[in-house]
């Protein structure tokens, strides 16, 4: 599948260059993940946006899209809870959960979805989004983040050791500001985010082979594919 997008400017996200999307990452749901920990120092725990496209296959375990953490009491994550058939978007600081959790039908629905979350500690606002639409309600209470980040993993919850994503993940972006998520979603068409303000991590997965993915944000923090995480031609 080939997705080609020409230059456009929608909702404040300027897609300045021709945009092709040939590959995504494919996770087996057993032990595949991507280590993005070189980028952990770029993430601002006081304010930020996470954005990614993902497609979940049938799974029998909890399936994290990503987890960024110091320890169990200080972490940021998006995870699908299999037994409850729910999605959880969580910012946890000093043991205080700021989270949105609600039922979801994404498992094995055959479709890519856009997932995003924004946090603004000083502004007292935490929001979650699926396909450009706010998911559940805005949360306003935060704990105080403690400690330096230990790891940033895609498709893996290292704190449990047994939770892995099964399916595809693509077009992963991190910002150190709150972004217009409807523009990131762009009516279901991934945007070229290179050059966007606040971009501190951007992994497009266009290598197609090998065991690393380049950071297109300009920060130079490549990701490492672990345990046979593969490339796929199935893209959003």
Residue ranges and their predicted role:
Residues 29, 48-58, 115-117, 154, ...:
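Short hydrophobic/aromatic patches on beta-strands that form ligand-binding or substrate-lining surfaces
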């Amino acid at each position: 599948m080939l997705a080609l997008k020409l230059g456009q400017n929608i909702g404040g996200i300027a897609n300045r260059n021709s945009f092709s999307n040939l590959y995504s990452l494919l996770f087996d749901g057993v032990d595949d993940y991507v280590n993005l920990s070189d980028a952990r120092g770029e993430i601002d725990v006081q304010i930020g946006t996470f954005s990614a496209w993902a497609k979940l296959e049938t799974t029998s375990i909890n399936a994290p899209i990503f987890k960024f953490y110091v320890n169990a009491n200080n972490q940021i994550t998006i995870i699908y809870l299999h037994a409850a058939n729910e999605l959880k978007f969580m910012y946890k600081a000093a043991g205080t959960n700021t989270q949105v959790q609600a039922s979801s039908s994404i498992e094995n629905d055959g479709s890519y979805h856009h997932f995003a979350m924004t946090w603004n500690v000083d502004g007292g606002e935490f929001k979650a989004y699926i396909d450009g639409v706010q998911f559940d309600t805005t949360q306003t209470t935060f704990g105080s983040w403690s400690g330096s980040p230990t790891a940033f993993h895609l498709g893996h919850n290292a704190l449990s050791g047994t939770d892995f994503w099964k399916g595809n993940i693509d077009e992963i972006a991190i910002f150190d500001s709150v972004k217009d998520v409807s523009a990131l979603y762009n009516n279901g068409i991934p945007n070229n985010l290179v050059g966007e303000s606040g971009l501190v991590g951007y992994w497009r997965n266009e290598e197609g082979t090998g065991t690393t993915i380049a950071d297109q944000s300009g920060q130079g923090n490549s990701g490492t594919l672990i345990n046979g995480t593969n490339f796929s031609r199935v893209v959003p």
